[in-house]
Amino acid sequence: MSAPHDGYGQFPPQQPTEQPPYPDQGYANPADAPPPAAGAPHAADHGKKKKRAYAAGAFDVAAGGNAAVGGQVQGGGQFGAPAPGYGGYPQPEAQPATYGAQPAAYGAQPQQPYGMPAPAPAVGYQAPEPYYPSAGAPPVPGDVAGLASGMSAMNLGPGAHQQPQQVPAQGRVGPLNQLYPTDLLNQPFNVSELDLPPPPIILPPNSSVTPSPDANCLPKYVRSTVNAIPTTHSLLKKSKLPLALIIQPYAALHDLDDPVPVVQDQVISRCRRCRSYINPFVTFLDHGHRWRCNMCNLTNDVPQAFDWDAAAQKTVDRWQRHELNHAVVEFVAPQEYMVRPPQPLVYLFLFDVSYAAVSTGLLATSARTILDSLNRIPNADRRTRLGFIAVDSSLHYFSVPKDSDENGETSMLVVSDLDEPFLPVPQELLVPLTECRNSIENFLTKLPEMFANNQNNGSCMGSALRAGHKLISPLGGKIVVLSASLPNVGYGKLEMREDKKLLGTSKENGLLQTANSFYKSFAVECSKNQVSIDMFLFSSQYQDVASLSNLPRYTGGQTWFYPGWNAGRPEDAIKFASEFSDFLSSEIGLEAVLRVRATTGLRMSTFYGNFFNRSSDLCAFPAFPRDQCYVVEVAIDENLTKNVVCLQTAVLHTTCNGERRIRVMTLALPTTTNLADVYASADQCAITTYYSHKAVEKALGSGLDSARDMLQSKVTELLQTFRKELAGGSMGGGLQFPSNLRGLPALFLGLIKHVGLRKSAQIPSDLRSAALCMLSTLPLPLLMQYIYPRLYSLHDMPDNAGYPDPETSQIVLPPPLNLSSERFVPFGLYLIDDGQTQFLWVGRDAVPQLLVDVFGVTDRAQLRVGKGALPELDNDFNERVRAVALKSRDHKAKGVGSIIVPHLYIVREDGEPSLKLWAQTLLVEDRADQGMSYQQWMGTLREKVST
C-alpha cells in the first residue's frame, strides 16, 4: 500500500534536531558561517515551510542533510548577512570580484563571495579610467562599444594618423585582498567553498591599454597558485607557498562550445627580444608608433599593417583589435610559422584481435563506433587520413581501395616477422577518408567477422607500435591503441608481475614503474616525429598500465582504462562507445609546442603534464588534446620592481582543419612585498592541482609513502608558517589559517586517501596507475571533484533542485554536502559523484514510495544493485533525480572539455558489502581502510603545528 502524498513515510515525524547536524561550528555570529552552496535557496526565500516527501515522516525543507549548508539559520539570520567577502574579504565598491566579471570557472551557479550582493561588473583591474585621453579631450564612455565616437573626437578613429601618448599605469591605489584568519577547528571547511572563484586579481588603475572586461585571463584558461606575486625569491621561500600556473588552453572539445577571438589578418606583433606577443598590458609610445614590451621593457615598432585592413583597403581602429582587448586570442599564423605544410589529421587504429578482445566484444564495439563516428571525425579540409592494423601474435595490415576503384576490395596482408616488420604497400595503408569513405565503411562492417573465431592469445602490440610509427612518421598523426591483453610477444614484451603480496608494502612501488625501457624511449622517438599515442585498455587481467601509460605521457596522449569491460553489459558498451566517439570528434591540435614567457625576473622552472620537454622552456605535443591541463612552476630569479607582472602562454599548433595558429593567453598579476597579501590571494584549488602533479611525480620516483609524507609535510609547513609569521605565534587552542585556504587540509586529505595514493593492500596496480594518470592530467574542476567528490542529498532536495533555473535554463543542483557519513540518514537517497563514477546510495530504511518513484519497485529486495542506469518513469521525482545525476556530470557547465561518461552504481546500504565499501571510500572525511578521518587528520596537523 503506497503512502499518502502529504508524508510518504510510515514513521513518526522527523524532527530537524534528530538529524546529524553539521559538526558544531561555534559561530558566535551567523555571518561567520560558510556560504550557502550553489542553488541553495536563501532562508528568506522559503516563506512558508513546505513539507517534503520521502523522509521517515514529513519534515521541513531546511531540515535534513542539506540544512547544514543551505538552509535556514536559527534566529532567522542568513549565512553571511553582513558578510565578509570571499573567505571573509570585505569587497570595497571599486574592487573587482574576479577576473573578467565571469562566474566561477566551474559550478552550476555563478558564486558570489560569501554572502555579498552581486558586485558591479569587474574588468580585471581596479577602477580604471574609461580611456586615457590627452589633455582637453572629452571623456570617453567606459564600454568598448562607446569607444568609436570618443576615438574620433580625439582624432583616433579610422583615418587618424596619430596615436596618443599612453598615460603610464599609476602606482597602486588601495589594498590588495585582505587576510581573514579562521580557526579550522571551530569553522571547518564547507564543500561549497570549492565552487567559489579564486581570490580576485586586483591590478592598479590603467594597467591595460583598453578598458575591456576581457583584458585579463579568465581562470578557466590560466590560474596562478597566488594572485599576488612576491617581489623577491626570499619572500616566496618564506611563505612556503608554491608559485605555479595551472594552464588549460582549451575549455571545450569543440571550438563552437568555447569560441575565442581570432585575429585573421596575419599581422602578428611580437617583441624583438623576448618574442612575447602584443597584449592588453603593453604600453604605446611615440604617438602610438611604438610599443614597450611588458615582459622585457624593450621598445618595438608597431607594424604598419596594425592599423590597416588589407582586405577592405582602409584604416582600422586599433583599439578594437582583439589582441588589445582580449587576454585570450588566437592568431592565424603566416608562412614563417611553418617548417612544412600543415599536416593532415591522421588516425592509425591498432586493433587487438586476440581471443580476449574478440570474446569481450571489444573488436566489434570499436569497429562499430568508428563506423558510426566517421561523420564526427574532423575533416573540413578533406585531408583526413585513416589506417588500420590488426594485432595478435602477427600484424595484419589492411589496404583499403579508393571508392573510384570499381573492383576494389580491401586486402589483408599478414606479417609474422616481428623483429623488422616491413610495410607492404605504405601508400595504400593510410587512406583519405573522403576518397575511400564507402570502402572504409565496408571494411569496418566486415572486420569483426574476419576474426570472430580467432583463438590466438598472443599480442605483439610493441611491434605493431613500431610498424605504426614507421607508417605515419613521414606525416605525423595519432596512433590509437585498443587493447584487451598484455603485450607478450615481440618488441616491448611485458611479463605478468602483479603480486598481491606486494600490495600495500614498500615493494609495491616497483609495480608502478615501467617494466620495459622500450616504452619511454619509443615514446620520445614518436614525439620527435610528431606521432602521438592514445591507449584504450580493457583487460580483465593484469595489463601493466604502469608501462603502457608511458606512451601517452610523452606524446601528448591519454590512457583510458576500462577494468573488467565487457560489451555484453549494455552499460559498458554504451560508456565506451560514447567516450570513444567524443574522442574521435575532438578538434585536437597537431604538431604543437607550448611556451610560457614572463616579466623579467620570473623563470619557468618545471613543467608537468603529458608532453615531451624538448628544451628548458619548450613543451612538444605531437597532438594537443582539449581535455587536459598542465602545471608550470615559476621561479623568481631577480627582484621584481614592477607593480604588475605578466605571464604569457603561447600554443603554436596546426588545427585539425589544416590551419597554423597561435593561441595566446596573457595573465597579469599584482606584486607585493607583504606576506599577508600573498596568503590572502592564495588559490586553494590551484595549489592542490600543483601538489597533485608533484605527488604523482613523487609516487613514480620515490614511492607512495614518500608522496603521502610530502603532502602531509607541505600542509603542516603552511600551517606552521602562517602561525609563526601571520598569527603572532599563538594558536589559542585552535588551528589558524586564512579563510581562502580553509579547504586545503580537506583537499590534501582527499589526495592522501585517493585510490592513486592511499595506503592499501586491496588496490590492483593497474587501477592505481590509471588513477595516477588522471591525477596528473585532469582539468582543475574535474580534478577537485576527483579528489573531493560531490555528495548530494536527493530525498530532501530543495524545491528548485532538479528543475531548470528560470534565468539560465541550467538544471539546479542540490547544495553539496561534506563527505561524511554523519550527513546520511537511514531513510535517505544520496548521489556520490567523483566525475569518473557515480553512486546512488539507498538508505536501509528508504520508504516504499521513494523506491516506487525512483526505481519503480516497492521493496528494497527487488532493487537491482551494481552497475546500471536509472529507469525512466513517468513521475516528477524520478525526472528530477535523473536530471541531477545528468547535470552532475555536465562538463560544459564546469568550463572544461571531457569525454568521460561516469558509470552509475546503485548501492543499497544493507546490500552487497564490497559495493558499499567501495562507495564509502569516497567519503573522504570518514575513517576507512588505513586512512584517518577528517577529525583525526586535523588533530594530527594541530599536534605537528604546535610542536
UniProtKB/Swiss-Prot annotation:
Gene Ontology terms describing biological process: COPII-coated vesicle cargo loading; intracellular protein transport
- Give the residue ranges for region: Disordered: 1-51
Question: Which InterPro entries does the record match to this protein?
Answer: ADF-H/Gelsolin-like_dom_sf, Gelsolin-like_dom, Gelsolin-like_dom_sf, Sec23/24_helical_dom, Sec23/24_helical_dom_sf, Sec23/24_trunk_dom, Sec23_24_beta_S, SEC23_SEC24_subfamily
Primary location group: cytoplasm
Q: Which keywords does UniProt give here?
A: Cytoplasm, Cytoplasmic vesicle, Endoplasmic reticulum, ER-Golgi transport, Golgi apparatus, Membrane, Metal-binding, Protein transport, Transport, Zinc
User: One GO CC annotation, please?
Assistant: endoplasmic reticulum exit site
| Region of interest (Zinc finger-like), ranges | 271-296
Q: What membrane topology was assigned to this protein in its record?
A: Peripheral membrane protein
A GO MF annotation of the entry reads:
zinc ion binding
Which segments cross the bilayer? none
- Subcellular location per the Swiss-Prot or TrEMBL entry: Cytoplasm; Cytoplasmic vesicle, COPII-coated vesicle membrane; Endoplasmic reticulum membrane; Golgi apparatus membrane
What residue spans carry the Pro residues bias annotation?
13-23
Write out the residues that bind Zn(2+). C271, C274, C293, C296
Pfam families cross-referenced by the UniProt entry = Gelsolin (PF00626), Sec23_BS (PF08033), Sec23_helical (PF04815), Sec23_trunk (PF04811), zf-Sec23_Sec24 (PF04810)
Q: Is Lipid metabolism one of the keywords UniProt gives this record?
A: no
Membership in a protein family: Belongs to the SEC23/SEC24 family. SEC24 subfamily.
What binding partners and quaternary form does the record give?
The COPII coat is composed of at least 5 proteins: the SEC23/24 complex, the SEC13/31 complex, and the protein SAR1. Golgi apparatus membrane; Peripheral membrane protein; Cytoplasmic side.
Question: What's this chain's function?
Answer: Component of the coat protein complex II (COPII) which promotes the formation of transport vesicles from the endoplasmic reticulum (ER). The coat has two main functions, the physical deformation of the endoplasmic reticulum membrane into vesicles and the selection of cargo molecules.
Record's protein name? Protein transport protein SEC24
Give the classification, highest ranks: Eukaryota, Fungi, Dikarya, Ascomycota, Pezizomycotina
Gene behind this protein: SEC24
